[in-house]
């Protein structure tokens, strides 16, 4: 063969592909983040009160006291002590939430990627999503709790302009958040207590790009000017409106779940007009008897590995006056 002649190497990667692909038989490198669905972020875990239960306990009792009073003393009168209204909130755990899958030996052996780790990650995310959904359901139910004198009830802000339609109004939402803050103030919620608001991404985007009557951005300009606000680099995962941290979530209920069998019974309600929820950390609490854990069992008779991921928690109302539901009707 002359030095300048072209050779004909065996292209053993092309297989019998049609059209010819010289890399058909070569394996791809699979990463967990690439193959699995995008993580639906759990935004509530660090934003409300969580109490761990010990084994053998089914519920946690939270004492509740009303405000103390003061009065002027009349000379010569005896101080007998004022009455202080007290109550308690009892939060019980739900049933054990599970996610379970079996992986057959033949599929695992023939697979050229680690299917086991992918499935286990997805199982954990499935539990986290239900946890998030139930926290939002409980927050909304807290906002619907009636007053039990002297303790105030929850707060509802209803405005048709808050609807998550084709063109949600960011300006209306900014005004609604301000209105909710006034209601919290009138309920004697401390001004220095952290406040959160969760909305669908469409409403979050409308708030982020809200403009005033002159077409000037009300939030976006501030995001560009401050590194801590998010801006372009961080995609503004959180924006602050009137001291309230606004986050976006896909886990809020927005349909009528009154008879939805897959929803745990105490969280079933009509959420068809719900468009957002705002809360302080003490509005609700979560009792956790068992954190997310993964168990595996070898089933020799079926030649498979059986995976179970489980979570044992429950949610309940603590202070309904700290929860606000935003409704479109």
Predicted regions and their residues:
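Short, polar loop/linker segments at the starts of domains and inter-domain junctions
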Residues: 75-80, 262-264
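Structured, hydrophobic secondary-structure cores that serve as assembly/anchoring elements
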Residues: 59-60, 67, 80, 87-117, ...
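Internal, well-folded beta-alpha domain core
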Residues: 141-142, 202-209, 245-248
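Sequence/fold signature of self-assembling virion shell proteins
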Residues: 2-46, 53-56, 63, 67-69, ...
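Oligomerization/assembly interface segments of phage tail-like spikes and tubes
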Residues: 98, 122-123, 305-309
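Alpha-helical scaffold segments that mediate packing/assembly in large oligomeric complexes
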Residues: 106-186, 325-329
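Membrane-topology and secretion signals of cell-surface/extracellular proteins
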Residues: 70-71, 75, 87
